[in-house]
A protein has these predicted regions:
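Catalytic cores of DNA base-excision repair glycosylases
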Residues: 34-251
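Polybasic, lysine-enriched low-complexity intrinsically disordered terminal tails
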Residues: 1-40, 250
C-alpha cells in the first residue's frame, strides 16, 4: 500500500519481500503459525500503542479509493511499491474502462499495462489483475470471496492484500495488514524484532486483541505517513514519544 521511498537514478528497486508486485512470494505461508504466549511487557506496550493510536486517529480508514470489493482488490494489488495517492490517480480511468472482473478479464494485457504504467512493475501487475479477474469469474461467479484461503489462491494476492479486502470491505479480522509503515513502526516501538512481513504479522496478532487488528493497521499507516516517517521521524510531535524505545532511530 505504501512505497518505501524514492530511489536514486540508476538504482534498482527491489520488490517487497512478503508480497511482491509480481504476486505472492513462493515461500509465503498461507497463515502465520501459532507462537508461544507473548511477554507481558510486550502486551502492555501494545496496549499503550493501541490506546494512543485510537486517540490520535479515531477515524482512520483505508486510503485507497474504491466503490466495490473488486475495485479495492485491484487497487491493493496495484499499491505494491507504489503510493496510495498514485494508485488513486490511476484507478478512476482504469475502472471506468473495466469496472468489473468480467470486463478486466477480457481486457488486452497491453492496454492494462498502459493504463497502470505509472504505478510501477506494470508488466507483472497487468498480468496479475487480468488473471485475478479471470479467477474471480471462473471460480467465484465474478464475486470477491469472503475467505482468506480463496483470496490468496488468486493471482497477485498475498496475505496483505487479502487482509485489506476482508477487513475493509467485509469487516473480517483475518490478520494484521503489514505494509512498509506498519513494519517500520512496529520495530521502532519494539513490538517485533522481525523484518519479514509474515513474521511481523504473527507477532502483532499475538499482541493485539483480534477486534483491533483492522483499525490498528489503518492507524499505524496514518501515523507512519504523518509523524513516524522513514527518515528523521518527528519524535517531538509524537504522542508515543514517552514510551517509544525508538529502535533503529538515529539521533
Amino acid at each position: 500500500m505504501a512505497t518505501a521511498g524514492r530511489t536514486s537514478p540508476g538504482k534498482k528497486r527491489s520488490a517487497p519481500r512478503a508480497e511482491t508486485a509480481a504476486g505472492k512470494s513462493s515461500a509465503q505461508p498461507a497463515s502465520p503459525k501459532a507462537a508461544s504466549p507473548p511477554d507481558p511487557e510486550l502486551k502492555a506496550q501494545a496496549t499503550r500503542v493501541v490506546r494512543r493510536l485510537k486517540a490520535d486517529y479515531p477515524d482512520a480508514k483505508c486510503a485507497l479509493a474504491h466503490d466495490t470489493p473488486f475495485q479495492l482488490l485491484v487497487a491493493t494489488i496495484l499499491s505494491a511499491q507504489c503510493t496510495d495517492v498514485r494508485v488513486n490517480i490511476v484507478t478512476p480511468e482504469l475502472f471506468r474502462r473495466w469496472p468489473g472482473p468480467r470486463e478486466m478479464a477480457a481486457a488486452p494485457v497491453a492496454q492494462l499495462e498502459k493504463a497502470i504504467q505509472s504505478t510501477g512493475f506494470f508488466h507483472n501487475k497487468a498480468k496479475n489483475i487480468k488473471a485475478c479477474s479471470q479467477g474471480l469469474v471462473d471460480l467465484h461467479g465474478g464475486e470477491v470471496p469472503r475467505d482468506l484461503d480463496q483470496l490468496v489462491a488468486l493471482a497477485g494476492v498475498g496475505r496483505k492484500t487479502a487482509n485489506v479486502v476482508l477487513g475493509t470491505e467485509f469487516g473480517m479480522a483475518t490478520g494484521v495488514v503489514v505494509d512498509t509503515h506498519v513494519a517500520r513502526l512496529s520495530k521502532r516501538l519494539a513490538l517485533t524484532k522481525n523484518t519479514d512481513a509474515v513474521k511481523i504479522e504473527k507477532d502483532l496478532m499475538q499482541l493485539l486483541p483480534k477486534k483491533e487488528w483492522v483499525d490498528f493497521s489503518h492507524r499505524m499507516i496514518f501515523h507512519g505517513r504523518q509523524v513516524c516517517i522513514a527518515r528523521k521521524p518527528k519524535c517531538a510531535l509524537c504522542s508515543m514519544n514517552i514510551f517509544c524505545p525508538k529502535i533503529g532511530v538515529e539521533n
